[in-house]
UniProtKB/Swiss-Prot annotation:
Annotated protein name in UniProt: Ribosomal RNA small subunit methyltransferase H
Compartments (UniProt record): Cytoplasm
Encoding gene per record: rsmH
Keyword Ligase: no
Main subcellular location: cytoplasm
Matching Pfam families: Methyltransf_5
């Protein structure tokens, strides 16, 4: 069953994407369908949605029943989507890089430290699971992953405790891992749960989320029409840095060769984006008050000035 999910920065996403009648849009991270549905309801447009999680197919079918040929779903991760999209181009593309509530709230998915369940964390159910990683990785690798992807200053202490624990028993549940992390750091009431950063780090590593994002951005020019908009909502400083650097590296004002000849200009064909958001937009205090998962969200948007 799909749990209730509140899309983050929904209004800001729609404003940046600016959907129009007759145009086609790509939702790279379908999840519970919040963005796709909002885009479809905003005007008489078309949406193609992607997701590698087979558990969202039922929700996609529900939306397809309501919107017919205006909606299409493809089961794939967005980095591998280019072949399946068959050279189709879009007027706008949106990525929500966060984990949806339906994934966090279902214990069997193994994403959440709030719900005890199998230690899995795989979006697609394939590849290395969190359980395999936690129980087989060397202490240094564990510490490096937790530090790099979780910004966790206690990463070495946590990694040491994990290795000590697994000498006596296998770490096979989210509850066990959460308690190991909490016992390593200490848990002060009212503060963010100490397990937050470690769980985030392992999830990002297991699903190669940063690698997938980088691979997609390298190829996104091939599927975005001229004047098409690219909107990315990220939840981690490393994700935001990748997006920020990509926008910066691919957007630049035309270079004037001579200060006396305004028409003597060159345009670098690799600088194909115009940044819409001068700096990352953050969730409003009101939204964070209603949805705590919005607290770390950042939105960046850019427009293709030519193909």
């Amino acid at each position: 069953m799909i749990q209730s999910h509140v899309p983050v920065m929904l209004n800001e996403m729609l404003e940046a994407l600016s959907p129009k009648d007759g145009e086609s849009y790509l939702d790279c991270t379908f999840g519970a369908g919040g963005y796709s549905k909002a885009i479809l309801e905003s005007c008489n447009c078309y949406v193609t949605a992607l997701d590698r999680d087979p558990n969202v197919i039922k929700r996609a079918e529900e939306i397809q029943q309501n919107y017919g040929e205006r909606f299409d779903f493809v089961e794939t991760n967005f980095a591998d989507s280019f072949a399946k999209l068959k050279e189709k181009k879009f007027d706008g593309i949106v990525l929500d890089l966060g984990v949806s509530s339906m994934q966090l709230d279902i214990a069997d998915r193994g994403f959440s430290f709030l719900h005890d369940g199998p230690l899995d964390m795989r979006m697609s159910g394939q590849g290395l699971s969190a359980e395999e990683f936690v129980n087989t990785a060397e202490e240094k690798e564990l510490a490096d992953v937790i530090y790099k992807y979780g910004d966790e200053s206690f990463s070495r202490r946590i990694a040491k405790r994990i290795v000590e624990y697994r000498k006596t028993a296998r770490i096979d549940s989210t509850g066990k891992l959460a308690e190991i992390v909490r016992s390593s750091i200490g848990f002060r009431k009212g503060k963010i749960d100490p397990a937050t950063k470690t769980f985030q780090a392992i999830r990002i590593y297991v699903n190669d989320e940063l690698g997938e994002l980088e691979q997609f951005l390298v190829n996104v020019k091939n599927i975005l029409k001229k004047d098409g908009r690219l909107v990315v909502v990220s939840f981690h400083s490393l994700e935001d840095r990748i997006v920020k650097n990509f926008f910066k590296e691919n957007s630049e004002k035309p270079v004037v060769r001579s200060k006396y000849a305004k028409d003597d200009m060159t345009i670098d064909p690799n600088k194909w984006l115009k940044i819409i958001t001068n700096k990352a937009l953050a969730s409003s205090d009101k939204e964070v008050g209603l949805n705590i998962r919005a607290r770390s969200a950042k939105l960046r948007a850019a427009k293709a000035i030519y193909e």
